[in-house]
Amino acid sequence: MDPCSVGVQLRTTHDCHKTFYTRHTGFKTLKELSSNDMLLLQLRTGMTLSGNNTICLHHVKIYIERFEELQKSCCDPFNIHKKLAKKNLHVIDLDDATFLSAKFGRQLVPGWKLCPKCTQIINGSVDVDSDDRQRRKPESDGRTAKALRSLQFTNPGKQTEFAPESGKREKRKLTKNASASSDRQIIPAKSKVYDSQGLLIFSGMDLCDCLDEDCLGCFYACPTCGSTKCGAECRCDRKWLYEQIEIEGGEIIHNKHAGKAYGLLSPCHPYDILQK
């Protein structure tokens, strides 16, 4: 079955028609979506879309129906987290995304989440009480129409444009110190861990750099391949993998597949790792 327009534009055609979240396969044209779903799709993908474009049922689940559920950590709009914050998260709705994006001059996407600390910063920086927030919320239809009109002259672009110098890739980037040698290993220059599609060569798995096997992508879109599964560096033809990562709260997540690749890996000096 051919890939959908969304998969082609995002360069994630290998994900089209997966049955992880739906038992059915097939397409929808974007004109079949409601105006609100069409708007959310544009904001969440950063794509310029038309009614004749198609979206497979898998991508409908990922970007529309289950997008909020799949956001597992704070989007960290102020670049304050050294590790991923995953507790007590608050969902950014369409109204808040529009309001806060205009207030702070950076693109916040409906469905992203904020931790209590970032929420406190917003509440402290934006002098708006609950009544004001209610007054600024127009009727649902008017809200959608206004946001759709704004897309006629501006588009948020790819999610990487939200914070090119930071983003989740930087949050998950391993600290450049002596401990880095235990966090990842480097393969010799002529060997690769990942193929040209970003899949693990020894297993064919499309493993996110967060090391969660069920994750469908939790990073900002990679500027090289467009995947949301690439961490600090694009996975395509990459010559190293993460052996473990540390998340907010000090929890260590180990790569269950590192052992399978152990025969491919060779020891390296920590200096080589720091040069990455």
Curated annotation (Swiss-Prot):
The modification Phosphoserine is found at residues 182, 266. One of its GO terms (cellular component) is intracellular membrane-bounded organelle. It holds the Pfam family ARF7EP_C. There is a cross-link at residue 176 (Glycyl lysine isopeptide (Lys-Gly) (interchain with G-Cter in SUMO2)). Disulfide bonds: none annotated. It is found in: Cytoplasm. InterPro entries: ARF7EP_C. Keywords: Cytoplasm, Isopeptide bond, Phosphoprotein, Ubl conjugation. Residues 159-183 are annotated as: Disordered. Interacts with ARL14 and MYO1E. Through its interaction with ARL14 and MYO1E, may connect MHC class II-containing cytoplasmic vesicles to the actin network and hence controls the movement of these vesicles along the actin cytoskeleton in dendritic cells. This is ARL14 effector protein. The gene is Arl14ep.
